Amino acid sequence: MMPESREYPSRPFVGVGVVVLKEEDVLLIRRGRPPRLGEWSLPGGAQSIGETVQETARREVLEETGVSIQNPEFLEVIDSIINDNDGRVKFHYTLIDYWANWESGTPQGADDAQHAEWVSFDHLEELGLWSKTIEVIQKARNLREIGSSAKYY
């Protein structure tokens, strides 16, 4: 069975993004493939069959950046729907965002990330990030400051 194309899909794809924090920096990647090719983003990617979303979060951060993370915690679910010029849905992702603190490793772009680096919170506005990305980064910072996260059972 051929995998379904991500362009013009018949159903949304599940993706996991991770806000990785280290002191006053956040780990960002420059995307190496569509959608948002060449844009700055959070590390993350598609969930594999048989994999929990927490396992996906750990794997994707490690694959794309070489960084290991501590205990990823649920942050938010976001829909990313991108239409073409005719109004047809070209991409549709259901993004499950997590946040985690850095554990080890030096960022280095790999897999489908052209580049990976720590970026100061003060410089996020300069990078042209998607507005939802900035929102989840701020939410993760706030949760880290209060030392807790929403738990779902």
Predicted regions and their residues:
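Acidic, metal-coordinating catalytic segment for phosphate/diphosphate chemistry
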Residues: 1-17, 88
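A structural signal for short, well-ordered beta-strand segments
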Residues: 18, 74, 98-100
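A cytosolic small-molecule/anion-sensing beta-strand core signal
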Residues: 22
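Conserved Nudix-box catalytic region and its N-terminal flanking loop in Nudix hydrolases
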Residues: 25-64
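A short coil-to-beta-strand element that immediately follows conserved catalytic motifs
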Residues: 68-77
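Active-site-adjacent beta-strand/loop module that shapes the phosphate/pyrophosphate-binding cleft
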Residues: 78-106
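NUDIX/MutT-family hydrolases
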Residues: 97, 108-140
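Charged phosphate-binding loop/patch that engages nucleotide di/tri-phosphates or the phosphate backbone
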Residues: 133-153
